[in-house]
């Protein structure tokens, strides 16, 4: 059974019997005969040989789903046995955006590896959409997201929160003389998290240019909703995919942008920061797990580093 699944999966990947046979180190006639026996047992074809390249039939797609489920079960069983044999070891594949991998995870991973030095970490970086697809395919052990529409599809645990601030170049700041701006030092000290920190209306910045993230990014969706709340269409100077890049372009004076408070790690005088009067500025991120997948000891230890979900990198006040 295991061998026939391997044969069918290789033909599916290569979409060609000859190439698949070469990869499997058997002859093409032997491979064709083995698959024909499976098709005879099922009473229907797995591959449509009339197409070029060959393709799966409906029965073939059902069989492929079965193969992939079996492969995942095998991997989970091996992981469980590995956990039993080596409780102080393990491997975890983590998926994250550049923002998450560069600004959130280093501190967490350092703490994890200090306590469990034999744990192996594999860090994958991709867009949120790609990470979601990899999680659905069970290619990741864990990833992170904050959109309610997204997180409901997966088992999840509260991980950390951040606060969205508006970063405005000093030279174009319309409120620069009103003593409501926050400096980078104040943000680093957590001043914006205190209850008496003043909030301002986003409408105050309706006349200055904005740098926005591309559609599909959570911060893009939030910014659109905040502009709607404020009742104006932003003067968009530039759109891009990376939050960190937007932050540096704002610091260069090109336009205002929304940033996470966790990005601000060093003093600077190029930008003023504002806490916008909107409930959308607080983001709760969750650790998301694949459905129906055994959670390894290593993954559980990693998730436990975030505690109750109130983990806030860099702020100790």
Where are the language model's segments positioned?
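Hydrophobic hinge/microswitch elements
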Residues: 127-131, 136-139, 146, 216-271
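Secondary-structure junction motif
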Residues: 174-177, 181-230, 295-297, 313-317
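Alpha-helical linker/hinge and terminal dimerization helices associated
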Residues: 5, 41-42, 63-85, 313
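A short LG(V/I)-centered, amphipathic sequence patch enriched
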Residues: 39-58
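Short helix-boundary/capping micro-motifs
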Residues: 9-30
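A late-sequence structural motif
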Residues: 170, 264, 271-316
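Central regulatory/effector-binding core of bacterial HTH transcription factors
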Residues: 89-152, 240
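Acidic, Gly/Pro-rich loop/turn segments at junctions of secondary structure
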Residues: 115, 127-207, 264-267, 279-281
């Amino acid at each position: 059974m295991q061998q026939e699944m391997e044969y069918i999966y290789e033909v599916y990947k290569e979409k060609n019997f000859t190439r698949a046979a070469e990869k499997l180190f058997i002859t093409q006639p032997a491979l064709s005969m083995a698959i024909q026996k499976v098709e005879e047992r099922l009473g229907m074809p797995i591959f449509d040989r009339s197409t070029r390249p060959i393709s799966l039939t409906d029965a073939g797609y059902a069989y492929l789903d079965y193969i992939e489920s079996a492969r995942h079960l095998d991997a989970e069983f091996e992981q469980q046995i590995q956990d039993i044999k080596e409780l102080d070891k393990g491997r975890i594949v983590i998926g994250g955006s550049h923002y998450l991998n560069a600004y959130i995870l280093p501190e967490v991973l350092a703490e994890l590896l200090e306590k469990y030095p034999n744990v192996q970490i594999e860090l994958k970086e991709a867009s949120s959409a790609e990470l979601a697809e990899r999680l659905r395919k069970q290619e990741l052990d864990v990833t992170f997201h904050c959109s309610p529409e997204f997180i409901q599809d997966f088992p999840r645990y509260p991980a950390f929160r951040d606060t969205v601030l508006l970063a405005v170049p000093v030279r174009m700041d319309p409120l620069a003389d009103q003593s409501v701006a926050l400096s980078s030092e104040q943000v680093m000290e957590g001043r914006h998290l205190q209850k008496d920190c003043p909030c301002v209306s986003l409408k105050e910045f309706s006349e200055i240019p904005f740098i926005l993230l591309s559609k599909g990014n959570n911060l893009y969706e939030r910014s659109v909703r905040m502009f709607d709340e404020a009742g104006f269409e932003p003067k968009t100077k530039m759109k891009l995919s990376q939050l960190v890049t937007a932050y540096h372009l704002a610091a260069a004076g090109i336009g205002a942008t929304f940033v996470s408070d966790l990005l601000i790690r060093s003093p600077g005088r190029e930008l003023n920061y504002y806490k916008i009067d909107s409930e959308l500025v607080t983001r709760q991120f969750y650790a998301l797990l694949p459905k129906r997948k055994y959670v390894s000891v290593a993954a559980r230890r990693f998730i436990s580093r975030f505690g109750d979900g109130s983990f806030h990198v860099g702020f100790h006040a």
